[in-house]
Amino acid sequence: MSEFQVPEIPAQFLPKHIALVMDGNGRWATERGMKRTEGHKRGEAVLLDVVDACIELGVPYLSAYAFSTENWRRSTDEVRFLMGFNRDVLRRQRDDLHEKGVRVRWVGRRPRLWRSVIRELETAEELTKDNTTMTLAMCVNYGGRAEIIDAARDIARLAAEGKLRPEQITEKTFPNFLDEPDMPDVDLFLRPSGEKRTSNFLLWQSAYAEMVYQDKLFPDFTQQDLYDAVLEYAKRDRRFGSA
C-alpha cells in the first residue's frame, strides 16, 4: 500500500500518456560519493513506484526513457553497465509487471543493442502482450530524430517502389511508420532533475504535450511527485492551437 494519498482526479482530466525522462541518476550518486551506476540501481525501484502510481491513478500509458541513442557517447564502462542493467531489470521485473496487468512494449532501434537485451525485451513483450491494465513503453536505444529519420526512409522506399503516393502521407498516416504506431500522443511530459529540455524524446508524439519539470533527481522521485505533476497537468487549459 502506498504511503502517499492518491488524489481523486476525474478521468477526463487525467493524462492518457505520460512520457518520463528518468534524469539525474548519475548526479545523485556522484553527490553522495558513489559510483554513477549506484544511481541507476536506485532508479529501478523508483520506476516501479511510478508504474504503481500510474495504475492507482488510472493512467493507461507510460513511456520511460531508459537508454537514448546519444547515451552511446558515455564511457565504455557506463554503457556496458547500462546494457546489462536494462537486461537484468526486465528479467527481474517482468513477472511482477505481468501479474499487475502491465503490457510491456519496446520502442527503439535494434542496431548496437546487445542480443541479450533484445531477447529480454522481446520476452517481456510476448509474456505481457494481452495485458490491459496499462502499457509501459521501455524506450531503449531510442531517439526522437532517429525515429523520424527511419520513418522517412521507409516512406521514401515505398514511394520509390510506387506503393505510396505523397498525398497519402498525412498527420494521421505518418505515425504508422514510427516505432510504435499505436502509441497515443503524449499528454504529460515529465522530467525530474531540474533540467528543462526534451532531450530528443518522443518528438513527434509530444507536439502538444504539457511540460512539467521538477527539481528532484530521479532516485529521490516519489509517487507523491508523480501525483503533484498530474495535479498540475489537470489544472492546465489545453487548447491545441485554438484560441
Curated annotation (Swiss-Prot):
Protein name (record): Isoprenyl transferase 2
Keyword Transit peptide: no
Known cofactor(s): Mg(2+)
Active-site residues per Swiss-Prot or TrEMBL entry: 23, 71
Gene Ontology annotations for the cellular component aspect, listed alphabetically: cytosol; plasma membrane
Function per UniProt: Catalyzes the condensation of isopentenyl diphosphate (IPP) with allylic pyrophosphates generating different type of terpenoids.
Cofactor remark from the record: Binds 2 magnesium ions per subunit.
